[in-house]
Amino acid sequence: MVTLSMSTRDYGLMLHMKKTVGRLNADVEISYPKFVDILVAVRNMVRECPYDICEMPFTTYICAREYGKKFTALPVFITRNFHHGAIFASKAAGVEKPKDLEGKTVGVVRGYTVTTGVWARGVLAEEYGVDLSKLRWTPTDDEHVAEFKQLPNVDYKFIGRDIGDLFRSGEICGAVGTVMGEIKSLGPLIPDAVEAGFAFYRKTGIYPINHGIVVRDELLERYPTLAVELFKALKESKDFYLANLDRAGALSAEDTLTVRLEEGLGGDPFPYGVEANRGGLEALTRYAFDQNITSRKYAVEELFPPETLDLVG
């Protein structure tokens, strides 16, 4: 019997598994070490692999594949978001619409390769015609994948700086990510961003993937049924969460969002499996290539264990 460590946040989708699944099969038990900060957990997983199974932002995972990291994702996506509301700009700097960002310096909360930034840049390029090569990007942190090579239009001189301070000082005119605090003349660049996200879904069928779950390759090779059994346990946990959500009661912020998504998307907002997510995966792998995070566009099938490609969740 082997005990595998699994590190994720306590999302509603995950709680049933964490409370009920100790023994996965005759050979494998799952332990859930006390969760550290998500940024710390992901950075450690990419650089040192201290966990056997770990939550990971999906473009961090794609970038990690580019540099030969020894773990593989399951087709399970435990966080998602629309990113129209993650694009901010300063009207004082003359930014009234997305195209106005061209020629400007735009901050990125955390690293250039973070999934929110990748989706936000995709929105700017594909929905609003912004030429991303004309923007200069300034992350506030380094990359999870330390080997990632600096791009000509990405400048890391603001690492450790606060995005709000950079706006106030006039050193940046826009930003992608979560911008905290009240900043005069600063606001979301896309009007009614929530509705814009749902409109994006109606047009594309995509509810953007943020975080998935990866498993160390050595374990997938040693235990041939592990990927499928983990998928089934994760699906059961998600199904339990959705089936037992007290939609008529007092809801947490997470649960309230889930109910709104069920209504807005017309069903399960968190489908697992490759085919149910092919549109989003194709878009994200294309964006990763277009934004020079990877040297080629990865085929969706390359990203998951072969035995999981036909699973439905």
What positions do the PLM features span?
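Immediate post-signal peptide segment of exported/extracytoplasmic ligand-binding proteins
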Residues: 1-5, 95-105, 290, 295-297
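Extracytoplasmic "Venus flytrap"
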Residues: 3-15
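Hydrophobic/proline-rich hinge and linker segments of small-molecule sensing/allosteric domains
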Residues: 6, 80-96, 208-221
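Short, glycine-/small- and polar/acidic-enriched structural segments
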Residues: 12-133, 138-144
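Short helices/loops that flank or line small-molecule/ion binding pockets
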Residues: 35-54, 117-118, 143-183
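Pocket-lining segment of extracytoplasmic ligand-binding domains
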Residues: 152-246
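Secondary-structure end/capping motifs
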Residues: 220-290
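Long, low-complexity C-terminal extensions of enzymes
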Residues: 275-313
